[in-house]
Amino acid sequence: MKTTTEMQLVPISKLVPYVNNARTHSPEQITKLCSSLQEFGFINPAIIDRDFNVIVGHGRILAAKEEDIQEVPCVFANHLTEAQKKAYIIANNRMAMDAGWDEEFLRVEIESLQGTDFDSLLYPYHFTRYS
């Protein structure tokens, strides 16, 4: 197992989206990602290879472009083969879809945010469901 530790800010103009990325990003999702960037900043790095090809983070990068962010944090995964990159792109997206929610913990966390400065428009489904 190899752990990647190299991270740096990379100009968005250098990043190359994976042309065969099977994951799509709706305008609504990009809007939510833009709101997240405004609220929290770009704190979840993209994963790229040595040639600046994007492996993970396509949606966040699209949102960063919308927000006119010039550089984004990127982790370099230079140890992956071409086949591993393709497999990781699919696996990373699929694993997120397979996750679930502990509804009780979610309700408690959302209730604890009521009355704070937190922008509830970021996740309207969850907030309206539990408000």
Predicted regions and their residues:
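Aromatic/glycine/proline-enriched transmembrane-helix motif characteristic
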Residues: M1-S131
